[in-house]
Amino acid sequence: MKNTLATILSVSTRLSRGLVASLVIAGALVMPAAAQEKPTLTVHTYSSFVGKYGPGKALKERFEETCGCTLAWLTSDDSGGILSRMKLDGESSRADVVLGLDANLAGEAEATGLLAPHGRTLPALDMPVAWSSKTFVPFDWGYLAFVYDETKLKTPPQSLRALVDDPSGPRIIVQDPRTSAPGLGFLLWMKEVSGDQAGPAWTKLRPRIVTFTKGWSEAYGLFLKGEADMVLSYTTSPAYHIAAEKKTQYKAAAFAEGNYLHVELAAAMRTAKQPELAARFIDFVLSERFQELMPEGNWMYPAKTPAAGLPASFSTLVRPSKALLIDFAKVRDGRRGWIDEWLAATAR
């Protein structure tokens, strides 16, 4: 009996020790897993921003270093795609933040009621226009411009009117304003300069428009293949050729009437699942570690110039004398009618 009891106690002790050990091991396995469960911030942006050559990867790493979270990207093809997805998803959107909305779509985006006020007094921004939006925070910007190869085009037009009025002027490639942010920008540029004569101006220019492309990359690729004398792009585009290819023959034309602005915006979603992280990301957008990646990461001017200044590739870029930008609400109310005007004037 004694031996039996001893045996039982021994077995019981071993079982207890085994149970404790099992619980300790199980705890050791569970605790790190729990520790690794971080909140996820979902940022909706356009695909090239997070693509192979965009700044997205570096920005994700930099934000995750300090946020104690995981940053996940939700992508659409372009700025217009971001707005369309916002409207489609509505209150059920997975996004906490939208990043990369074109300012020309800001009025329409704000009218959805899906965006939250940023609630900040923004620092001084290095932009050619004053900024007062209570919803949107700009993170980069650029002037739209026609880019050309100075070894092939010796006398580029010096104004938009000259480009439109010269029947023997350069052949150009532009983007479709229904599917492209720069294309929409050019539509507004024509409207701002030509007013109620925008339709006739399009009709004059149409014979020298090689094609309207869906997006910027298609247009620029055709230009580089020699399909046109000029392409609608940005004054910052030559910086890429300088920095990446050591080529200096690509130039951008500054027009006498001024050049239209392209401004990219960030905003927090009112329906954000992670509102505190969304607020931190909006702060991050204007930080040094975000802004310093814009010039040679997104090939645009930063909204707030980093302490180190702009890279050398930006030092010779043309600076237009005037920046054009139509009020958000006016664009929201007029865009569809102006596109109809463009369609009627350019249809073949």
Where are these regions (language model features)?
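Extracytoplasmic ligand-binding site segments that recognize negatively charged/polar headgroups
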Residues: K38-T40, H44-G56, D78-G81, S93-A228
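Short alpha-helix C-terminal cap/hinge motif
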Residues: K57-W73
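A ligand-binding cleft/hinge motif common to bilobed small-molecule-binding domains
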Residues: N104-E108, L224, A228-Q249, N298
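Short beta-strand->loop
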Residues: L115-L122, K134-P138, R161-V164, M230, ...
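Periplasmic-binding protein-like
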Residues: P128, G142, W202-R206, F212-T213, ...
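A bilobed periplasmic-binding-protein/Venus flytrap-type ligand-binding module shared by bacterial periplasmic
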Residues: A145-K152, K191, H262-Q274, L293
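An extracytoplasmic/periplasmic, membrane-proximal ligand-sensing/linker region
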Residues: A198-G199, P302-R348
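Mature extracytoplasmic/periplasmic domains
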Residues: M269-A323
